[in-house]
């Protein structure tokens, strides 16, 4: 048995001397592998008589167990040492500033800023936010909004359609956030007062149009809602958003399938060489469309038009952002140009509030 004891002592010494996991694995293979020294001893047991096999087998198994335990313990030590070395090499000095100088700090995108400004203004008037899916059905996007069959907006050149289903119906990318109004009227009972911001999609691309753009719509449904309420809300919104004490507005008759009467809204402005100033001047600029919700839309959403009436409006978030902050090309909003963002962006922690100033 002295040979077995010597072998065990040598293997344990090799384990203790292993400097890394690769060296330790080599020791394991040399001892316990298919052709290892202890494995070779176990293979000789079959040639022994029963009494000798019992004695020798127990001794060899004790040696194997001792080697296995030593391997496990040494592996744990080596793993802990490797982790400590890695952590030491990757030490972060938490007293150092997290960012580079202010010129290289990230900036909040103007669309995110304007989105927050809209939310602050309408929240102050008691509106909540309603959201819905970008992928819509024809029923929610057109039919329930009083778009007749054959309306140009239903054509492929204006709307992104998915491939038809087996029943012939097709999903589409919503062309406006009005389907959110439909979903709200179907799921809530009046009074309703919501704004519906989100992404919308139309097959169009030029200096003032992109295939994907952002829109915000507002909806009020109640028993006594009328155009006077609508005009007041829009007037207060324009004063707050453009940060002027007063602004003249012009309401022109128009047509939208989902409102009756329908109106387009212009605001007074002065056009300069590099900017547009609101609340003064002799020019007019269209900013949004609005109107009283069409009785057919109320009926399609399960509301009695003899009991309830309401009004709605919609505007492009991208467009009003360009008007307020002097951006000339809509496509630049989506080009991810860091130089452009550093010029037009906002500090991330400057949260817009009516009390503190929207864009201060």
From Swiss-Prot:
Cellular component GO terms held in the UniProt record: cytoplasm
Cofactor: Mg(2+)
Subcellular location: Cytoplasm
Gene3D superfamilies: Bira Bifunctional Protein, Domain 2
Entry's Gene Ontology BP terms: phenylalanyl-tRNA aminoacylation
Pfam families: Phe_tRNA-synt_N (PF02912), tRNA-synt_2d (PF01409)
Presence of keyword rRNA-binding: no
EC number(s) from the headed UniProt entry: 6.1.1.20
Gene Ontology MF annotations: ATP binding; magnesium ion binding; phenylalanine-tRNA ligase activity; tRNA binding
Cofactor note (record): Binds 2 magnesium ions per tetramer.
InterPro entries cross-referenced by the UniProt entry: aa-tRNA-synth_II, aa-tRNA-synth_II/BPL/LPL, Phe-tRNA-synth_IIc_asu, Phe-tRNA_ligase_II_N, Phe_tRNA_ligase_alpha1_bac, Phenylalanyl-tRNA_Synthase, tRNA-bd_arm
Record keywords, A-Z: Aminoacyl-tRNA synthetase, ATP-binding, Cytoplasm, Ligase, Magnesium, Metal-binding, Nucleotide-binding, Protein biosynthesis
Catalyzed reactions per annotation: tRNA(Phe) + L-phenylalanine + ATP = L-phenylalanyl-tRNA(Phe) + AMP + diphosphate + H(+)
Ligand binding (Mg(2+)): 260
Self-association and partners: Tetramer of two alpha and two beta subunits.
PANTHER family, per the entry: PHENYLALANINE--TRNA LIGASE, MITOCHONDRIAL (PTHR11538:SF41), PHENYLALANYL-TRNA SYNTHETASE (PTHR11538)
Protein family (similarity comment): Belongs to the class-II aminoacyl-tRNA synthetase family. Phe-tRNA synthetase alpha subunit type 1 subfamily.
Protein name per UniProt: Phenylalanine--tRNA ligase alpha subunit
Species this chain originates from: Rhodopseudomonas palustris (strain TIE-1)
């Amino acid at each position: 048995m002295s040979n077995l004891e010597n072998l065990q002592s040598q293997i344990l010494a090799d384990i203790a001397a292993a400097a890394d996991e690769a060296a330790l694995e080599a020791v394991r293979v040399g001892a316990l592998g298919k052709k290892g020294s202890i494995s070779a001893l176990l293979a000789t047991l079959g040639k022994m008589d029963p009494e000798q096999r019992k004695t020798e087998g127990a001794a060899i198994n004790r040696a194997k167990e001792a080697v296995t335990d030593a391997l496990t313990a040494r592996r744990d030590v080596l793993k802990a040492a490797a982790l400590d070395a890695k952590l030491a090499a990757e030490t972060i000095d938490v007293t150092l500033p997290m960012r580079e100088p202010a010129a290289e700090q990230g900036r909040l995108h103007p669309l995110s800023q304007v989105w927050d400004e809209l939310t602050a203004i309408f929240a102050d008037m008691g509106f909540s936010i309603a959201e819905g899916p970008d992928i819509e059905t024809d029923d929610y996007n057109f039919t329930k909004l009083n778009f007749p069959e054959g309306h140009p907006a239903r054509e492929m050149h204006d709307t992104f359609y998915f491939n038809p289903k087996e029943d012939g119906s097709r999903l589409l990318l919503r062309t406006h956030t009005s389907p959110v109004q439909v979903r709200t009227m179907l799921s809530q009972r009046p009074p309703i007062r919501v704004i519906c911001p989100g992404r919308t999609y139309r097959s169009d691309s030029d200096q003032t149009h992109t295939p994907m753009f952002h829109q915000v719509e507002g909806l009020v449904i109640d028993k006594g809602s009328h155009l006077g309420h609508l005009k007041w809300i829009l007037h207060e919104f324009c004063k707050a958003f453009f940060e002027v004490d007063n602004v003249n507005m012009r309401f022109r008759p128009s047509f939208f399938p989902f409102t009756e009467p329908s109106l387009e809204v212009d605001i007074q402005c002065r056009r300069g060489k590099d900017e547009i100033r609101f609340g003064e001047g002799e020019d007019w600029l269209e900013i949004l469309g609005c109107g009283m919700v069409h009785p057919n839309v109320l009926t399609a959403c399960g509301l009695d038009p003899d009991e309830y009436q309401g009004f709605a409006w919609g505007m492009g978030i991208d467009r009003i952002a360009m008007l307020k902050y002097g951006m000339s090309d809509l496509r630049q909003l989506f080009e991810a140009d860091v130089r452009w963002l550093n010029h037009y962006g906002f500090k991330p922690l400057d949260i817009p509030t009516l009390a503190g100033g929207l864009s201060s």
